[in-house]
């Protein structure tokens, strides 16, 4: 039986790193992690790591073609509320537009998509959707 291919996006973050480490210990999975920056723990597990910008549509499409994941776990985000409040365009690009594109890539490739988010609701005092 072929090993399930799992792609963990945001693998350098707190949650993503723990998920990547746990999944990479299970040899029935072929685990790949990706993040904007180089792997912070390059010798910590049995996984492949690819540096990728989730806001770059072409790079994400190439990643999906290369990995052909069965399951995608997205833990990436701009998650500091004060920063997001003052950097709307960047927050929207990472937390909305990139996630929409991830969902499209998953749909096109037949991958299951698990998206982890936050319980924070931003704003409420502006006319912008939240």
Language-model features: where?
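Active-site "gating" loop of Rossmann-like NAD(P)-dependent oxidoreductase/epimerase domains
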Residues: 78-81, 86, 119-130
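N-terminal Rossmann NAD(P)H-binding glycine-rich loop of SDR-like oxidoreductase domains
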Residues: 3-26
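N-terminal Rossmann-fold cofactor-binding loop
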Residues: 32-42, 53-54, 76-77
């Amino acid at each position: 039986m072929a090993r399930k291919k799992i792609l963990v996006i945001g693998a350098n973050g707190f949650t993503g790193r723990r998920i990547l480490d746990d999944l990479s210990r299970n040899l029935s999975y072929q685990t790949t992690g990706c993040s904007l920056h180089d792997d912070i723990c390059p010798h910590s597990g049995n996984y492949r790591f690819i540096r990728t910008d989730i806001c770059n549509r072409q790079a994400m499409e190439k990643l999906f073609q290369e990995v052909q994941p069965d399951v995608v776990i997205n833990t990436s985000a701009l998650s500091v509320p004060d920063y997001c409040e003052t950097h709307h365009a960047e927050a929207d690009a990472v937390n909305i537009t990139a996630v929409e594109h991830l969902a499209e890539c998953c749909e096109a490739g037949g991958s299951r998509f698990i998206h982890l988010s936050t319980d924070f609701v931003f704003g409420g005092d502006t006319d912008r959707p939240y």
